[in-house]
From Swiss-Prot:
GO terms for molecular function: GTP binding; mRNA 5'-cap (guanine-N7-)-methyltransferase activity; mRNA 5'-triphosphate monophosphatase activity; mRNA guanylyltransferase activity; polynucleotide 5'-phosphatase activity; RNA binding. PROSITE patterns: RNA_CAP0_MT. It holds the Pfam family mRNA_G-N7_MeTrfase. This is mRNA-capping enzyme. It comes from African swine fever virus (isolate Pig/Kenya/KEN-50/1950). Its main location: virion. InterPro entries: CYTH-like_dom_sf, mRNA_G-N7_MeTrfase_dom, RG7MT1, SAM-dependent_MTases_sf. One of its GO terms (cellular component) is virion component. The active site is at K282. The record marks K627, R658, H713, E806 as: mRNA cap binding. Residues 594-868 form the mRNA cap 0 methyltransferase domain. PANTHER family: MRNA CAP GUANINE-N7 METHYLTRANSFERASE, MRNA GUANINE-7- METHYLTRANSFERASE. It catalyses: a 5'-end triphospho-ribonucleoside in mRNA + H2O = a 5'-end diphospho-ribonucleoside in mRNA + phosphate + H(+); a 5'-end diphospho-ribonucleoside in mRNA + GTP + H(+) = a 5'-end (5'-triphosphoguanosine)-ribonucleoside in mRNA + diphosphate; a 5'-end (5'-triphosphoguanosine)-ribonucleoside in mRNA + S-adenosyl-L-methionine = a 5'-end (N(7)-methyl 5'-triphosphoguanosine)-ribonucleoside in mRNA + S-adenosyl-L-homocysteine.
Length: 868
């Protein structure tokens, strides 16, 4: 890419090039990512200034010939003109992506008449040209683009809409007459019309800023803001690729900085007790970077805050991370990037914190209130000591700001790799949404009206890549709310549709609310209650500070991932007491040790083989899905819609984390839309079935398959539970649908206990190197397998040496009950039958498979049943 000075010089040389004497030489500034709102803003601003203008209508047909664009253009009512357009050079400004623009130097050369074919691209243009000076004209164009069969089908209709309006078009009435919407593209271009030898790079920058100021009156401040972010990034990032993203505006301050993660129980389980971590309070402020650069001191937060100058010799750079209170101009530092020219980003937090207080003192020299956040190093795992530590931080009354949570900082990692978690009471967890009023006359059952309320839809932002990987679809009415140009960008709005509540994007706004006219605004909201088909949302405030971001077309409230992970704290509330005692419901807390590697791989292989039998099915239900251990297998199998049901909220929260992890780190050929339902499967089948059928988009006829891996033993306490399970499967499956159970086989377990003469309260063990690897404790006295209710204790690979109680599965009784409820047995097989296939799959793992592993695996099997 050339420099701007070089491009201007090349432009001037073109006029002395004899080979170009019959060519049209154009120097244009083209603005990118123009949506309807931006277009309308600039258009109305120019009309209001009563700048001389003209309107033209044209039809350009573009045909690709040997990688060149050959064009036929008809500027109505004149004749066709044939030419080819050849780009020579371009220069792209380093602006925020939503305000980005580039300078283009190109030539148009006449060519012979050519014949159009079906590959032609047709562009109908309604252009208003504002001659803002003798040197520059601004062209604002509404474009309709047609290709292939669209040309013959729609050309006449769009010519009428764009050109043949009832009244003669002027700059003042054009927008009203053609009423542009999502059918169109929008272009803003500035063309130089002065003497070539008079043009300078400074002239280009000046006119560019003039138009950008029309788009955003704060543009020059935004430019300074972006330059400040570049300065910070230059001291944090070493990758030229990442720095380029900052310079191009694709990344802003939020993407640059390590983010504080909303902590769920699943997160906390992984490092509880948090010995070695640092704890401080969460101030109710905004994230900000305090910078001392030369003689200037400023804070980069939601905007650029200039806080003064030393008036003395330039200082070495100091860069601090913290929370900023804009109204009071107060800064509370919690990390340091650079202190007096010394870069600290590769040091652990325990080292950086020593320099933080010194950096704060440098800020204080600028006569602003700056403090270091109070940190406590957690040194004890005792819950009582932890409680006192957390209380001393969260319940402290002497802080100069309101406290709305707790921050936990991991030691030992670099600045960018430091894990920082925030805990907030459920009430203080809020989300930012772009709110749009629901279009009328959609006739969507889920959009049922409520008297005294107006229905609005809640949107967040999402990348095109994540949208595809999560297999999301736009909600009904979406195309009426957002133009096609916005939907074709890399980042666009999507309805807030978390896995556990797909209709969470519905908001019924009270007619009596003090917040009026909320359509098109960004609102901070909290969940008050989850109703059957919608969420009872409360408006906290209108984010007036985000309205300008919204106009740029690159911001739509929270990012989808951030929003759903924050939402998890409504789904699985995390109490203050659990910070000290540890999260409740820690069934999945233990990790498998290395001795289970081969056996675990064998079980995984078998489950993978079973799930592949249902590959590419439309709707699959997993009963007892847990934290999503099989999620990757479903994704590999190309399941289109997966419904996971479990009563463990913490496990389901972990599953949702895995959903995003798979979407960002693993490649799958097919995308899967994931839904979760927090539900005890022992409850009545009718109630559970109704909840599943209420899932947005779930087919009336039912799912294609139901899978339950190593779960149904929980439902073998009584014959009533087994009956309920069979009824549930029948209600949820389509005719011909399949049930796939993997389970410990009660018959085989009883046989093992008899063979080893294990009596009541005695334990069968399988040891390796004097270590108990597998164990079953007999908790029943009967010598014969009962239909239900016989309990055993099982030592699980992830149970940290503790026995977990479960019921024996009488497979004969299970099959009998299912047959009674309209199912047929398709297949029943022991896991041991897969061992030869596993040997072929991985000879290295098979070699370390022990006899104990094989014995344990032989206790399991799978059952396949079909709904008649």
């Amino acid at each position: 890419m050339a420099s701007l000075e070089n491009l201007v010089a090349r432009y001037q040389r073109c006029f002395n090039d004899q080979s170009l004497k019959n060519s049209t030489i154009e120097l244009e500034i083209r603005f990118q990512h123009i949506n309807f709102l931006l277009f309308k803003t600039v258009y109305e601003a120019l009309v209001a200034q009563e700048i001389p203008s003209t309107i033209s209508h044209s039809i350009r047909c573009i045909k690709k010939v040997h990688h060149e664009n050959h064009c036929r253009e008809k500027i109505l009512p004149s004749d066709n003109f044939y030419f080819k357009k050849q780009p020579l050079m371009f220069f792209k400004f380093s602006e925020p992506a939503s305000l980005g623009c580039k300078v283009s130097l190109a030539i148009e050369q006449p060519i012979r008449k050519f014949i159009l074919d079906s590959s032609v691209l047709v562009r109908l243009k309604n252009r208003t040209t504002f001659q803002i000076s003798d040197l520059w004209k601004i062209e604002l164009t509404v474009v309709k683009q047609l290709m292939g069969s669209e040309v013959s089908a729609k050309l006449t209709a769009f010519k009428t809409l764009l050109f043949d309006t009832p009244e003669q078009q002027t700059a003042k009435n054009m927008m009203t007459l053609i009423n542009p919407d999502d059918e169109y593209l929008y272009e803003i271009e500035i063309e130089y019309t002065g003497k070539p030898e008079s043009l300078t790079a400074a002239d280009v920058i000046k006119i560019k800023n003039t138009v950008l100021t029309l788009i955003s009156p704060n543009h020059l401040m935004l430019t300074a803001y972006h330059q400040a972010i570049e300065f910070i990034a230059s001291h944090i990032l070493s990758s030229e690729i990442l720095l380029a993203r900052i310079k191009s505006g694709k990344w802003g301050l939020k993407r640059l900085l390590p983010q504080v993660k909303s902590m769920t129980k699943a997160d906390y389980m992984k490092f509880y007790p948090p010995v070695g971590y640092y704890v401080t309070d969460k101030a109710d402020g905004i994230r900000g970077i305090a910078v001392i650069q030369d003689t200037q001191m400023y804070v980069v937060a939601d905007q650029l805050y200039s806080l003064g100058t030393t008036g003395i010799e330039p200082l070495k750079p100091t860069i601090l991370d913290g929370e900023f209170m804009p109204e009071k101009k107060e800064f509370y530092g919690f990390d340091v990037i650079m202190y007096e020219g010394n870069l600290l980003t590769q040091q652990g937090f325990e080292t950086r914190i020593e320099a933080l207080n010194k950096g704060i003192k440098v800020l204080q020299a600028f006569n602003i209130k700056a403090e270091m956040k109070p940190f406590i190093s957690l040194t004890s795992a005792d819950p009582n000591v932890l409680l006192k530590n957390f209380e001393s931080v969260f319940k402290k009354k002497t802080r100069p700001y309101s406290i709305d949570g707790i921050i936990l900082v991991e030691p030992g990692n670099s600045y960018l790799n430091t894990n920082t978690f925030k805990w907030k009471p459920t009430w203080d967890n809020t989300l930012d949404f772009l709110v749009r009023k629901c279009p009328e006359s959609l006739n969507v059952p889920e959009y049922a009206p409520k008297k005294g309320f107006s229905l609005h839809l809640l949107f967040v932002g999402i990348s095109g890549e994540l949208f595809k990987k999560l297999a999301l679809n736009w909600c009904p009415g979406y195309t009426k709310l957002f133009p096609v140009t916005q939907r074709n960008q890399n980042y666009f709005p999507v309805q807030f549709q978390p896995s556990d509540f797909p209709l969470a994007f519905l908001y019924y706004h009270p007619d009596t609310s003090s917040f009026s006219d909320i359509d098109g605004k960004v609102l901070e909201m909290r969940c008050l209650k989850r109703e059957v088909n919608y969420v009872s949302w409360e408006i906290v405030k209108i984010r007036e500070d985000r309205q300008q971001d919204l106009k740029t077309g690159g911001y739509f409230g929270n990012d989808f991932k951030t929003a759903e992970l924050t939402w998890l704290n409504y789904m699985d509330p995390f109490s203050f007491e659990e910070l000290a005692k540890g999260p409740s419901g820690m069934y999945f807390a233990g990790a498998k040790t290395g001795i289970y590697r081969a056996q675990t791989a064998l079980i995984s292989f078998i489950k993978q083989e079973i799930i592949q039998k249902i590959s590419h099915q439309s709707w699959v239900i997993d009963l007892g899905i847990g934290k999503g251990q099989d999620l990757g297998r479903y994704l590999d199998a190309g399941i289109r819609h997966l419904v996971g049901i479990d009563k463990d909220q913490t496990a389901l929260a972990e599953l949702i984390y895995r959903k995003f992890s798979h979407a960002t780190t693993r490649q799958h050929k097919h995308a899967t839309n994931i839904y979760v339902l927090h539900q005890d499967l022992a409850e009545p089948a009718k109630e559970i079935s109704e909840k599943v059928h209420q899932i947005y988009g779930f087919p009336k006829e039912g799912a294609s398959s139901i899978v339950s891996n190593l779960f149904i033993h929980y439902l073998m306490k009584s014959s009533q539970q087994v009956e309920n399970l069979a009824v549930l499967c029948h209600k949820l499956l389509q005719p011909g649908g399949m049930v796939w159970f993997t389970t410990m086989l009660g018959e085989r377990v009883l046989e093992l206990l008899h063979e080893n003469r294990v009596e009541l309260n005695e334990v069968w063990e399988a040891r390796e190197n004097e270590v108990v690897k597998f164990a079953i404790k007999r908790l029943f006295k009967e010598d014969v397998l009962q239909e239900t209710g016989q309990e055993i204790g099982v030592l699980l690979p992830f149970s940290n040496g503790d026995f977990y109680n479960e019921y024996l599965v009488n497979t004969a009784f299970l099959i009998k009950i299912f047959k009674h409820h309209g199912f047929s047995l398709v297949q029943m097989q022991s896991f041991k039958d897969w061992i030869p296939e596993f040997q072929t799959f991985s000879k290295s793992l098979y070699k370390i498979l022990t006899e104990a592993d094989k014995t344990w695996t032989s206790l399991f099997g799978f059952i396949c049943l079909r709904k008649n």
